[in-house]
């Protein structure tokens, strides 16, 4: 109120973004057989909070409510224009915030929120892979071996401002090439969180049909937030959506 900022908090409108805090709250995402099991007590606890925050004004219905279905919507422009106090997003935002915000105001990254089960976000990002059908396997192998060396990775991460997947480098082995102290701190904060990422989050990120789960989660949760469904109805629809889409994929 003192700063006249209209939106206390915003999150990326995506199932991927919501899944990390849900896992922190105890969501398991899969059953004992490894099959998708999205709705459990952990997921309900996190989605209930998101629902409540939208009802009491902590989060703005106008942001998530401005799109439908599984459409992604970020709040990066609102945050860069000082219209949001706290923004839950990914490390890919850091370079553009350093460029767009500069020193217009102080912005500061904090670790992923903790729940009863973990302090975790979701892994993700880009990957450089070798194709098995290359006509030059020996040369490609040498290149990949060079790029995978700790020194090479440190230089690559430092220049590209990517968060390292290498656990040793993630705990302080990268000198990020930016003069912006806020961006450097943000990159170090995200890097330091890599070792604490939950195994459930890695399993979900690696699941080939995770998009089915992400889309069902965000689309049905949003319908509850804007008043089209109750939360209990949204949970039932999430499970129906996932079952139907997986059945369709099995026929492809």
Language-model segments: residues:
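Bilobed periplasmic-binding protein-like "clamshell/Venus-flytrap" ligand-binding domains
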Residues: 1-12, 61, 149-160, 244-252
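Extracytoplasmic/periplasmic solute-binding protein
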Residues: 1-45, 51, 75, 84
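Beta->alpha turn/N-cap motifs
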Residues: 89-94, 126
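Paired acidic/hydrophobic, glycine-rich loop segments that form the ligand-binding mouth/hinge
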Residues: 85-90, 108
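C-terminal capping/gating helix-and-loop segments adjacent to ligand/active sites or protein-protein/ligand interfaces
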Residues: 185-241
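Extracytoplasmic/periplasmic substrate-recognition and gating elements
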Residues: 55-59, 99-168, 199
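Glycine-centered hinge/linker elements that transmit conformational signals in sensory
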Residues: 35-67, 98, 112
């Amino acid at each position: 109120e003192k700063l006249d900022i209209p939106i206390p908090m915003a999150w990326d409108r995506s199932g991927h973004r919501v899944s990390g805090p849900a896992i922190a709250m105890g969501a398991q995402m899969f059953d004992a057989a490894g099959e998708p099991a999205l709705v459990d007590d952990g997921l309900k606890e996190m989605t209930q909070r998101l629902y409540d925050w939208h009802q009491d004004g902590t989060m703005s219905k106008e942001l998530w409510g401005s799109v439908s279905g599984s459409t992604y919507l970020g709040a990066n422009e609102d945050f860069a224009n000082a219209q949001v106090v706290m923004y839950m997003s990914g490390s890919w935002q850091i370079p553009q915030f350093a460029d767009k915000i500069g020193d217009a105001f102080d912005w500061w990254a904090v670790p992923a929120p903790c729940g009863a089960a973990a302090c975790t976000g979701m892994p993700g990002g880009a990957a450089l892979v070798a194709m098995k059908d290359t006509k030059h396997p020996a040369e490609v192998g040498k290149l990949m071996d060079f790029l995978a060396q700790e020194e090479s990775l440190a230089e690559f991460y430092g220049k590209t401002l990517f968060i390292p997947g290498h656990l040793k480098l993630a705990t302080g082995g990268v000198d990020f090439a930016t003069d912006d102290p806020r961006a450097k701190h943000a990159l170090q904060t995200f890097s330091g969180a890599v070792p604490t990422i939950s195994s459930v989050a890695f399993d979900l990120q690696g699941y080939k049909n995770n998009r089915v789960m992400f889309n069902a989660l965000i689309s049905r949760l949003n319908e509850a937030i804007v008043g089209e469904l109750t939360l209990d109805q949204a949970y039932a629809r999430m499970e129906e959506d996932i079952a139907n889409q997986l059945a369709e994929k099995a026929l492809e």
